[in-house]
């Protein structure tokens, strides 16, 4: 049995015990108590699968947590703050642009725009966004630029629909790339986006998309105005 699996179960058991003590003092709200009940069932199932006694695992988990806390400073216990990363300058973010053949699609809480009159261009995607725990947290603005600096596409959050995940952003980027590539443009993304928006990309700095997916994405954005 993998040692990480065992220690993870032990720590989960102890943390559940701490939460149970908290609830016993009538300090937990309804969602807290609901999660406590669901997690209890989950721990019982995991204990049966692993063949481990929950009470014994709880004691072992307490020792693990105590060792960790002994090594932690007060500074380390602070919640890390999001980092704000910028591919674009203020001028690039605030510049007005227009489309000869405008196409627009709303995907969840993100709005995707592109100019389908653009053909046979080398295009780079740049974005300004915040990062939390080394993952994209909030997209501020993403724009597609030609080598000449013209803006030909954009992804922006909708003010009326706040909240999006890194997967939402990744999917929106895929739609934008598919639409631009439909017109024989070559699209790549900035190194910053490669690092935080997705974990795998090809040598051209863009996520690998099979031809059938690119065609599907292009048709999707083609049908939305």
UniProtKB/Swiss-Prot annotation:
Q: Where is this motif: Nuclear localization signal?
A: 34-38
Q: Where is this region: RNA-binding and homodimerization?
A: 1-73
- Is Transport set as a keyword in this record? no
| Entries under InterPro entries matching the protein | NS1 (IPR004208), NS1A (IPR000256), NS1A_effect_dom-like_sf (IPR038064), uS15_NS1_RNA-bd_sf (IPR009068)
Q: Post-translational modification, briefly?
A: Upon interferon induction, ISGylated via host HERC5; this results in the impairment of NS1 interaction with RNA targets due to its inability to form homodimers and to interact with host EIF2AK2/PKR.
| Positions of short motif Nuclear export signal | 132-141
Q: What are the BP-aspect GO terms? A: symbiont-mediated suppression of host cytoplasmic pattern recognition receptor signaling pathway via inhibition of RIG-I activity; symbiont-mediated suppression of host gene expression; symbiont-mediated suppression of host mRNA processing; symbiont-mediated suppression of host PKR/eIFalpha signaling; symbiont-mediated suppression of host type I interferon-mediated signaling pathway
How does the entry describe the domains?
A: The dsRNA-binding region is required for suppression of RNA silencing.
Family of the protein in this entry:
Belongs to the influenza A viruses NS1 family.
Q: What is this protein called?
A: Non-structural protein 1
Recorded source organism is Influenza A virus (strain A/Chicken/Hong Kong/715.5/2001 H5N1 genotype E)
């Amino acid at each position: 049995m993998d040692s990480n699996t065992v220690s993870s179960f032990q720590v989960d058991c102890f943390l559940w015990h701490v939460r149970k003590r908290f609830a016993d003092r009538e300090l937990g709200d309804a969602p807290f108590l609901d999660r406590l009940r669901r997690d209890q069932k989950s721990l019982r199932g995991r204990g049966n699968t692993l063949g481990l006694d929950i009470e014994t695992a709880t004691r072992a988990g307490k020792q693990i947590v105590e060792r960790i806390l002994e090594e932690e400073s007060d500074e380390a216990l602070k919640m890390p703050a999001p980092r704000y990363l910028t591919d674009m300058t203020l001028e690039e973010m605030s510049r007005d642009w227009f489309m000869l053949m405008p196409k627009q699609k709303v995907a969840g809480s993100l709005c995707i725009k592109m100019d389908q009159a653009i053909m046979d261009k080398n295009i780079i995607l740049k974005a300004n966004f915040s990062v939390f725990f080394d993952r994209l947290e909030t997209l501020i603005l993403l724009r597609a630029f030609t080598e000449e600096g013209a803006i030909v596409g954009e992804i922006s959050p909708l003010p009326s629909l706040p909240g999006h995940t890194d997967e939402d952003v990744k999917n929106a980027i895929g739609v934008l790339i598919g639409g631009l590539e439909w017109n024989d443009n070559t699209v790549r993304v900035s190194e910053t986006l490669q690092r935080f928006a997705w974990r795998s990309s090809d040598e051209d700095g863009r996520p690998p998309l099979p031809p059938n997916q690119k065609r599907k994405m292009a048709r999707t954005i083609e049908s939305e105005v």
